[in-house]
From Swiss-Prot:
This is Green-sensitive opsin-3. The lineage of its organism: Eukaryota, Metazoa, Chordata, Craniata, Vertebrata. InterPro entries: GPCR_opsins, GPCR_Rhodpsn, GPCR_Rhodpsn_7TM, Opsin, Retinal_BS, Rhodopsin, Rhodopsin_N. Disulfide bonds join C113-C190. It comes from Psalidodon fasciatus (Banded astyanax). The chain crosses the membrane at residues 40-64, 77-102, 117-136, 156-179, 206-233, 256-279, 288-312.
Amino acid sequence: MSGLNGFEGDNFYIPMSNRTGLVRDPFVYEQYYLAEPWQFKLLACYMFFLICLGLPINGFTLFVTAQHKKLQQPLNFILVNLAVAGMIMVCFGFTITISSAVNGYFYFGPTACAIEGFMATLGGEVALWSLVVLAIERYIVVCKPMGSFKFSASHALGGIGFTWFMAMTCAAPPLVGWSRYIPEGLQCSCGPDYYTLNPKYNNESYVIYMFVVHFIVPVTVIFFTYGRLVCTVKSAAAAQQDSASTQKAEKEVTRMVILMVVGFLVAWTPYATVAAWIFFNKGAAFTAQFMAVPAFFSKSSALFNPIIYVLLNKQFRNCMLTTLFCGKNPLGDEESSTVSTKTEVSTVSSVSPA
């Protein structure tokens, strides 16, 4: 069905009218009428870069955590959950996208498109809700609205279960008829259908549900908890209510989690903003690149969390170096890290960045 500024097919939407006769099915034909071939090659190179970094970084994060028992602390379970989310995006999303970019169209077909869109949405939502759990944990531990509280393994596992449940309630509906996954941007990757008003799929109600429940609500919770947390940390520092080591540990853990939140928002906010604009301006003209740039930039979120974790968590850095160098840390920080870990584990929910 051709509109003024777009063309809707059975399983796709092209942001170009077919009055020129150029529009072709993105599952069958090359899409070089949307962009020059070099742009598809550039996209393939970008995805190759993300795979080359995302796979080893997230994979090594999981491996090092499994190798070192002192990293297997409750709050670290949530951080591992973030690495799992990154692995899902890399293995089940990026690999399909790079193949499509090399070929110039989504040649795997509609079923693979649905799988790729589902996995990308699932990974992104697991990461977002994991950050919500971390934000709530920081709020409860630092602000103490419930008095003295220790984040236990059962709390961590419950939090992980919650992240996957919420992620599934966002990613699964398009697979069962509430909206759908279709190619977007340069037609090399797939996402929810923000573009059409097809009554068969009830796209409007799903998109509103997704934006409100799975973006606005979690982001609001994160901002509220960190707003309260910053005020509490400043008040505690001014009143000297806690020891200097406890305050330092709490500040450093909080800084790490805040940077993870900032990284997620930097990666995903442009995509959410553009998707919202397209949704609320149905029929408006836009280019394939207009959606492609934020869509593919959002995929970089798979790298942010493990990099921040490695840079700011001294205990993890030492364990990583010990693993890399076959049991020896070339920096010789293992002993001091162990001492600081014992102090910080008792005060900051078993996380010890330094």
